[in-house]
Design a protein with these regions (language model features):
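Conserved ATPase-coupling elements of RecA-like P-loop NTPase cores
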Residues: 59-66
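Loop/turn-to-beta-strand initiation segments
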Residues: 46-49, 78-83
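Conserved P-loop
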Residues: 1-40
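Conserved small/polar residues in nucleotide/adenosyl-binding loops
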Residues: 116-122
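A short helix-turn-beta junction within AAA+ P-loop NTPase domains corresponding to the substrate/partner-engaging
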Residues: 96-108
Length: 126
């Protein structure tokens, strides 16, 4: 991430893995707060690429409504791209997308090290 300098903004908006949650209501509030921040970036024409990592999981778990996601994405300026990641997108989300890619797991760092030692720079090898 050092390579990009001030051209990249990164926001970690959760507190760990959703399957280990201790407080579902707190997690839902974090997702909603994070979504409001994401929408501010989505609407800003200065940002050309917004990646919402694992947001599809948040939709599947009922933390945020998929219509809210679709409506928010539709607020983007013409040259802005929004990437949603996560497994199990609904047909409605898929139908609303310009591009859908299904990935096949070949190698993943979660298999090699404990979760507590992973950071984004470790995963990206930055």
């Amino acid at each position: 991430m050092k390579t990009f300098g001030d051209k990249l903004k990164f926001h970690a908006c959760g507190e760990g893995f959703t399957w280990e949650t201790q407080d579902r209501n707190k997690d839902i509030n974090l997702v909603k707060s994070s979504w409001r921040k994401a929408v501010s970036y989505i609407k800003d024409p200065n940002y050309k690429l917004i990646i919402l990592d694992e947001i599809i999981v948040a939709v599947k778990l009922g933390y945020i409504d998929e219509d809210e996601i679709i409506n928010g994405i539709n607020l983007r300026p013409e040259l802005t791209h929004v990437v949603l990641t996560g497994r199990g997108a609904s047909e409605k989300l898929i139908d609303s997308a310009d591009l859908v890619t299904e990935m096949k797991l070949i190698h993943h760092p979660f298999r090699a090290v404990s979760y507590t030692h992973l950071t984004l720079p470790t995963i990206l090898r930055v």
